[in-house]
Amino acid sequence: MICIPVIDKNINDALKSAEEALKVADIVEFRADLLESVDKQDIEKMAKYPSIITIRADWEGGEYTGDNNKRIELYKTAIENNVKFIDIELKEEKNKELVEFRNKIGSKTKIIVSYHDFEKTPSKQDLMEIVEKELKIGDIAKFATMAQNKNDLLKIFAVISIYEGKIIGIGMGEVGKLTRIIGVELGSILTFASMEGRSSAPGQVDVVKLKKIWELLK
């Protein structure tokens, strides 16, 4: 699966961007934390699209600085509307509450539990421990770490292979681009690609280039 992040500041622009992105991608990620303001009605509109809804907290590299209880309630709105995925941080103390809420109401939403390190890639053992913690909470484990060398790539590829089909593993930065290209082949459920030069993280490959590379690798 290819996922294109939607990073607009205005909800109407975000919905238009999603429609364009879905012409070339399988799914979009609405970065709701990047909106100038976000309410339940906005979440309901986003949930109608094949999407991941992410309201990334500022302490995990996002831009949401509002009340955390409101953030959790917005996630619950996404779950009530059966959005395909939500992405909640491993460090968020209320992540289990969202899983329990999903289970209680019988929502079809899958919960991605994520970890980010914008400076380095931890050891393979540490990455595996992170993934194990994430899978004890949610449906899909995600890690995005800064890749600085070939050893980092090997660690990332190894962990993706171990948890094939229930993981999103990403190496950020220029060195990490290779993980975005072949991670899906090794077992990552999706990769994030940019569109028209707009990206949400360092190292995202343009969607058109990514598809051309995949064609060459067939």
Curated annotation (Swiss-Prot):
Active-site positions, per UniProt?
H116 (proton donor/acceptor), K142 (schiff-base intermediate with substrate)
Keywords (alphabetical) are: Amino-acid biosynthesis, Aromatic amino acid biosynthesis, Lyase, Schiff base
Task: Spell out the disulfide connections.
Answer: none
- Write one Gene Ontology MF term: 3-dehydroquinate dehydratase activity
Q: Does the keyword Oxidoreductase apply?
A: no
One GO biological process this protein is involved in is: amino acid biosynthetic process
Name the PROSITE patterns for this protein.
Answer: DEHYDROQUINASE_I (PS01028)
> Cross-referenced Gene3D superfamilies, in alphabetical order?
Aldolase class I
UniProt catalytic activity: 3-dehydroquinate = 3-dehydroshikimate + H2O
Residues that, per the record, bind 3-dehydroquinate: E29, F30, R31, R56, R180, S200, Q204
Q: In which pathway does it act?
A: Metabolic intermediate biosynthesis; chorismate biosynthesis; chorismate from D-erythrose 4-phosphate and phosphoenolpyruvate: step 3/7
> In the Enzyme Commission scheme, what number(s) does this protein have?
4.2.1.10
Protein family (similarity comment)? Belongs to the type-I 3-dehydroquinase family.
Cross-referenced NCBIfam families = aroD
- Biological role: Involved in the third step of the chorismate pathway, which leads to the biosynthesis of aromatic amino acids. Catalyzes the cis-dehydration of 3-dehydroquinate (DHQ) and introduces the first double bond of the aromatic ring to yield 3-dehydroshikimate.
What quaternary structure, including any partners, is listed in this protein's UniProt entry? Homodimer.
Q: What is this protein called?
A: 3-dehydroquinate dehydratase
Q: Which organism is it from?
A: Methanococcus aeolicus (strain ATCC BAA-1280 / DSM 17508 / OCM 812 / Nankai-3)
